[in-house]
Amino acid sequence: HMAGSTEILAARALAGNIEDICSVAIFAVAATSSIVIGREIGQGRDSATVYDVGKAMDTLALACGLVLGTFLTVGAWTWLPTAVYPIFSLSPQASSIASMMLSFTGVFLALRSFNSANIVGVLRGGGDVRAAAVIDITPLWLVAIPLAALFGLVLRWGIFWVYVGIVSEQVVKFFLGMWRLRSGAWINDVTRSAPS
């Protein structure tokens, strides 16, 4: 469907694996956030304290994503093309596309990390599963997929613009997630009392 689709697929196969390696740390922070928030609520902490802990976990995730994203973005144009790409015999065009993909991933990794910790960790950990699901799924189906399809399949703008459409999901999730976080409505005590 797109010009250079063979190179795009080869680049995506490699970039996707490198992205998955970076995602391990992001998901670890998100899972930890869920545990910490659930513990704070379960111990009967007041809403202001739980809110502050949620903000702290989101900030930690943002910092983690910023460090990993910087490492990935710099690596995409320095050591990955010389040390990793040759192992997979990527063509020069596929190497360039892989570096572009990894740069997009790196630039938006801090935002993605924040969103994961906020939605999967803080909101779900606070018992706000319904809002977390809506914030997580809606931008994918109403923003990212339609924009990526429009840019790539209808307008045929190329893989750069397809990635612009894909990462737009993270921007929408950020604003929806921040709105929900600031509302404080996500703090729900879902613990059960011990039977007497």
Q: Model-predicted segments: where are they?
A:
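Short helix-kink/termination motifs in transmembrane helices of multi-pass secondary transporters
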Residues: A3, V74, T78, I145-P146
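Helix-loop interface residues and adjacent transmembrane-helix termini in multi-pass membrane transporters
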Residues: A3-T6, G125-G127, V154-R156
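Small-residue-rich hydrophobic transmembrane alpha-helices
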Residues: L9-W77, S113-A132
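Short runs within selected transmembrane alpha-helices of multi-pass transporters and secretion channels
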Residues: I26-A30, F104-G125, A131-L140, L147, ...
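Hydrophobic alpha-helical transmembrane segments of integral membrane proteins
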Residues: S34, L142-V143
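Short alpha-helical transmembrane segments in multi-pass integral membrane proteins
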Residues: I37-F108, F151-S196
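Hydrophobic alpha-helical transmembrane segments in multi-pass integral membrane proteins
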Residues: A144-G152
